């Protein structure tokens, strides 16, 4: 990253025998820095902060020395700051705040110049000449639409730095549409590494768009934008990719849902805080008159973690369906089978089949991924007193923990649910029975005889299915 402002600090001594020598050294150093920035070709600003020692006094010629240094180096007065001595803590904080405010204005102007330069280059409508000679075998030149995506992306990032989120969103949207157009992503073969690189860039731009909309508190628009990207990529992968009936696609779906959950966790959305007990946010005024679907509203993070868990279930199911021949490492498979396997699976941001679900070694821990998403979702629902969904997620967590034989955590989740279960009073006997059997297995393996007897007594009810003891 090239800095917008290069801030340097220098101290001046009050010793008259060393003042001239030190001032000359400071001027020489500042001049060298200034010349170096000019030769680099970048528009980085240079700002100087001079600190005077504690025994100095403004009446002792300190201001004259500072003016002499500034004029000798040709520094703009707006970029040259003096911190007087013997100031209180409050005064120093005020000086620091004023300095940062002035430097911030220079940084904004720096990024405004860069954005103007990027828009000017895009408006030329020609492919720029390469700055370095192409290397045989490794050169990947861009087409004109590719350069347009590059310039739009740069303009959007510079607008983000200036906190102009509306302008940034428009530039990101333009870059997104050009990238997913018929002249770029759709003509890249899905076996090429550039295909996954282009998909990654599309995801990055979509995430940036979400960030801009959430920054501007356009929450419904952000959810719609999330769904729009999901639908566009689904259509693209179905038409020119490897389809959506594979573990790789559901790995992406799970990750895309988690992106929105992470956004909600990190952003200070006060209207959706657990203390408000709100499940979702009402639409903003600009779209309040439209007929919105429930899934177009911004729900709390638990909703998105639960969605991520559902796709992780599908990922595991597709992974377990991988044929044994494809689960072998490439070194143990014929070359022809390795070549055919390379074009059969979507491995965008996920492991190869022999790493996803290997024959002999431990592959991806799907249970851990699912359990992590379920527990996060359960925590969010519990904060908002959505007890029925908390019970459902607790049972889902218990199923995963049962497969790993973590009986202590199964007990921790199911004992409160079994003692205060609304499904029992409402006649949901199949759910009640499922909870009972799973809790009985955990109690038996935890040596809780009292709990085993109590559960057995309930399972002997005539309304339950035929009792088959499962130890």
Where are these regions (language model features)?
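Extended alpha-helical scaffold regions
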Residues: 1-471
